[in-house]
């Protein structure tokens, strides 16, 4: 896994026009070189549900008229930059409106993340619904048609759900559809099925391609869940809600798992999607150095403008940190922790925990 990565978010509403109109291969390559970047995660599908390439398994964004993903991959590969591909797994707002019966439901029938359709926000999809097969076809398509260096599936985790699909399946399995323990037991089954089907979808065309399921946190004490990933990406933006103590503790846990991992921060002053926000260069230098000091590779989150033009101020900022990391890489790879003090994780001892229950920790 490469040291100097960027996670290039591109969640773009169908109400925005002229998508990708200012994309320019040379400008894209210049930004990557300026940022000292050697891997960039690019979008096949965003939280709004749109594809950024011609698609039979999905629908291309209504205001995009060319293969943006393909153009980005070609530009990156020309200069030796790897291109993992991102698909939003747990969120698909287009299908949330077309198939509300595919949504995760709470006990009171409300949805999550947004509680209903009168509240602005995304609505989480249930992997026990036909949505899973819809997602699998999208993964197969992108693995078949594009030279991906990995697959990143977002908003994935064990999710208790009271939708009618889940209730019916629990009854078929002889479980109590409303008992909290049985609901969680079933949620584990649903996640396992999702993980196995998505892995099979990748392997159908790209056997052994790196695959990561992101839930915003690596659950401590659940090594079985780690095994569904080829590597780990520790999403942890200090100013974005995770805090400055989250990453070191999470990285310390990952040091004992025997898998490659990276620390994912962001260029934002606050959190994801903040086009006009830039953290101080010294803050990013610190976060990149912190990742390296904890045995991790690094990824910096950015949000591409709907126009497709890379923001050079952002890549100057990233370059100020990654140029320093690049000088040290030969001493940072294949390292082992020399810590001789164990850390007890409260999370590993509080019992069952799901992505829908994170606030209990």
Model segments located where?
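Short, solvent-exposed turn/loop segments enriched in Gly/Ser/Thr/Pro and often Arg
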Residues: 6-11, 41-48, 87-94, 152-162, ...
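Carbohydrate-binding surfaces of carbohydrate-active enzymes
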Residues: 2, 10, 28-31, 39, ...
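Active-site-adjacent "subsite" loops/lids of carbohydrate-active enzymes
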Residues: 85, 89-146, 184, 195-197
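An active-site-proximal structural segment forming one wall of the substrate-binding cleft
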Residues: 31, 35, 123-158, 201, ...
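Aromatic-lined carbohydrate-binding/catalytic grooves of carbohydrate-active enzymes
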Residues: 33-68, 91-118, 160, 167-170, ...
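Short, polar loop/linker segments at the starts of domains and inter-domain junctions
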Residues: 17-25, 358-360
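Active-site cleft segment of glycoside hydrolase catalytic domains centered on the general acid/base Glu
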Residues: 125-128, 159-188
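Boundary/entry segment of secreted carbohydrate-active catalytic domains
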Residues: 1-21
């Amino acid at each position: 896994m490469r040291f100097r990565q960027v996670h290039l978010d591109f969640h773009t509403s169908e109400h925005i026009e002229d998508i990708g109109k200012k994309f320019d291969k040379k400008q894209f390559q210049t930004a990557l070189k300026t940022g000292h970047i050697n891997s960039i995660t690019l979008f096949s599908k965003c939280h709004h549900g749109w594809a950024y390439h011609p698609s039979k398994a999905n629908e291309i964004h209504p205001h995009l008229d060319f293969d943006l993903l393909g153009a980005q991959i070609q530009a990156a590969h020309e200069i030796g930059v790897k291109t993992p591909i991102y698909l939003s797994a747990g969120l698909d707002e287009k299908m949330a409106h077309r198939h509300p019966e595919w949504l995760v439901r709470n006990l009171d029938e409300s949805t999550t993340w947004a509680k209903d359709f009168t509240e602005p926000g995304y609505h989480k999809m249930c992997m026990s619904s036909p949505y899973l097969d819809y997602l699998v076809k999208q993964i197969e398509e992108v693995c078949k048609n594009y030279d991906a260096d990995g697959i990143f599936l977002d908003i994935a985790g064990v999710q208790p759900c009271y939708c009618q699909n889940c209730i019916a399946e629990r009854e078929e399995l002889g479980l109590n559809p409303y008992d909290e323990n049985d609901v969680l037991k079933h949620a584990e089954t649903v996640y396992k099925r999702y993980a196995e089907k998505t892995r099979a979808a990748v392997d159908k065309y790209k056997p052994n391609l790196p695959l990561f399921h992101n839930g915003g946190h690596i659950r401590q004490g659940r090594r079985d869940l780690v095994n569904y990933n080829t590597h780990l990406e520790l999403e942890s933006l200090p100013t974005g809600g995770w805090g400055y103590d989250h990453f070191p503790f999470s990285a310390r846990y990952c040091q004992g798992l025997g898998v490659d991992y990276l620390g994912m921060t962001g260029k934002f002053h606050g959190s994801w999607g903040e086009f006009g926000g830039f953290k101080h260069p010294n803050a990013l230098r610190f976060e990149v150095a912190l990742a390296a000091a904890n045995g991790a590779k690094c990824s910096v989150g950015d949000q591409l403008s709907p126009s497709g033009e890379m923001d050079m101020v952002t890549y100057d900022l990233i370059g100020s940190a990654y140029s320093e990391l690049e000088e040290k890489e030969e001493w940072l790879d294949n390292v082992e922790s020399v810590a001789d003090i164990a850390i007890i994780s409260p999370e590993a001892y509080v019992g069952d925990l799901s992505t829908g229950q994170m606030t209990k920790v």
